[in-house]
Amino acid sequence: MLRSLLLRRSVGHSLGTLSPSSSTIRSSFSPHRTLCTTGQTLTPPPPPPPRPPPPPPATASEAQFRKYAGYAALAIFSGVATYFSFPFPENAKHKKAQIFRYAPLPEDLHTVSNWSGTHEVQTRNFNQPENLADLEALVKESHEKKLRIRPVGSGLSPNGIGLSRSGMVNLALMDKVLEVDKEKKRVTVQAGIRVQQLVDAIKDYGLTLQNFASIREQQIGGIIQVGAHGTGARLPPIDEQVISMKLVTPAKGTIELSREKDPELFHLARCGLGGLGVVAEVTLQCVARHELVEHTYVSNLQEIKKNHKKLLSANKHVKYLYIPYTDTVVVVTCNPVSKWSGPPKDKPKYTTDEAVQHVRDLYRESIVKYRVQDSGKKSPDSSEPDIQELSFTELRDKLLALDPLNDVHVAKVNQAEAEFWKKSEGYRVGWSDEILGFDCGGQQWVSESCFPAGTLANPSMKDLEYIEELKKLIEKEAIPAPAPIEQRWTARSKSPISPAFSTSEDDIFSWVGIIMYLPTADPRQRKDITDEFFHYRHLTQKQLWDQFSAYEHWAKIEIPKDKEELEALQARIRKRFPVDAYNKARRELDPNRILSNNMVEKLFPVSTTA
């Protein structure tokens, strides 16, 4: 309405400016001519009286003022008229526009996002039961009413696999240790307990978990359902630590599963992606609490090839961190402290400050360079802590934020990171839950693929071939790929939905993760980084995954928007995993699919004729 009114006024004004010029056009009619009609002579009318002289013209500034004052008045009037012309019902007052105020969100609307801020939903149906009875009642009622309650853990999955706008259930309040069997080294816990919380609770019993992922804030239910893993070619993914579990299902109520009780469903549900039931309780096989010696040193791919078999077999835990656009490979091994020689006595050659200094120097140099390039831009280090106080990963984020999609700039940052690791070589001793953690950096996009790598006795070397091809791809396509490319290994899993599933006990699997950080809050820049990451991921998928039989980690897989790409992904998943068996179990345990979400439905489409 406002636009049409403005257009009318503009047209009228334009027409008005033409009226004076019309008086300058001479008419063909003259009062001094004689008009003849049927032989009669008509006397023309007397001339009109002279017009009064026009008022003196307004100055240009006065005319402009009146014009824009009129526009302003019209805009205000139109806005007020629009506002009062569309009343809202009482129950929708939060939607009403309020002058100079943001409309508040409803109090019952929950915003839930993953830790990287890459996936977010809002829902009014967010449930946190306090005990098993509450959970059972919630699942039963939701099943009867066909209300969705997708299980969600700590929200740490990079792809937000637990999120659903329709509704969620979170077990953060069900976080108790229920039983500890010190002799058998087993512990029974509620599934909402966090990994670090569990480790702290059982350390007085002399127990700990067999292996850990990079971080400790996951809920136990979530970490097993998505097939999370640590590293060590003799150690399986974390779902293999599950001895038995209690599953609250919509159709069959609470069922107990173990290797003895319905082993087929037990193995299927261990890594069940939250689609077969809400994991309420878990019994885990633990190990004696122990200290580890971590050895970090820098190598290169040529040297790694010579020692790879020994590195896999001789170390309890091992991982490689590759730094794109350099020859640097950071090798990290972890082994129990020797009972005879004790921890190593070697002291580091460099202090932490000395190790980080090269990165600090590059940051100082870079902010000067980018300030000169864009003098109107606020200095990146304004109103921020002194760079002497920043950790290496924080400095890396700030460096990348300056020009995250420039491959030359990213390569310089990677070279500085390689220098940091060269000066960080050495040993570290601590409890296993402290040593096996890893500072992953800030918010990020990540993709991790898993593929077979032979056996421990006879590695196929496909894992190193994969890395060689990946590094060539990065350099050929000038991908602004930051560090690290992380490579880890596990033994096989007996859970059919696990990417590391195998029926052969000796098989080992390699896990390779690529990354792009989101070191900025600027939405446009985050979108540009996101687009570049998905281009990076698409290239690796196209050129490497089929060649190496690689499949993505369930917590890192992303659903394609393109219909043909989605169909190709579904066909690929069906080739590797028992989709029909999984969907059959879903139909039996959750016929209304209240535990599902869009991601599960797209990955495991259920036939309507089944």
Swiss-Prot record:
InterPro entries: ALO_C (IPR007173), FAD-bd_PCMH (IPR016166), FAD-bd_PCMH-like_sf (IPR036318), FAD-bd_PCMH_sub1 (IPR016167), FAD-bd_PCMH_sub2 (IPR016169), FAD_lactone_oxidase-like (IPR010031), GL_DH (IPR010029), Oxid_FAD_bind_N (IPR006094)
Enzyme class: oxidoreductase
EC number: 1.3.2.3
PROSITE patterns (UniProt xref): FAD_PCMH
Cofactors required: FAD
Transmembrane feature ranges: 68-84
SUPFAM superfamilies: FAD-binding/transporter-associated domain-like, Formin homology 2 domain (FH2 domain)
Effect of pH on activity: Optimum pH is 8.8.
Residues making up the propeptide: 36-101
Main subcellular localisation: mitochondrion
Effect of L156 to A/C: No covalent flavinylation, lower affinity for the substrate and lower activity
Molecular-function annotations in GO: D-arabinono-1,4-lactone oxidase activity; FAD binding; galactonolactone dehydrogenase activity; L-gulono-1,4-lactone dehydrogenase activity
Loss of function: phenotype: Delayed germination, chlorotic cotyledons and death at the cotyledon stage.
Domain FAD-binding PCMH-type, residue spans: 123-258
Keyword Membrane listed: yes
Keywords assigned: Membrane, Mitochondrion, Oxidoreductase, Transit peptide, Transmembrane, Transmembrane helix
Transit peptide: 1-35
Pathway field: Cofactor biosynthesis; L-ascorbate biosynthesis
Biased composition (Pro residues): 43-58
Record's subcellular location: Mitochondrion membrane
Region of interest called Disordered, as start-end residue ranges on this chain: 17-61
Protein name as annotated: L-galactono-1,4-lactone dehydrogenase, mitochondrial
Organism in which the protein naturally occurs: Arabidopsis thaliana (Mouse-ear cress)
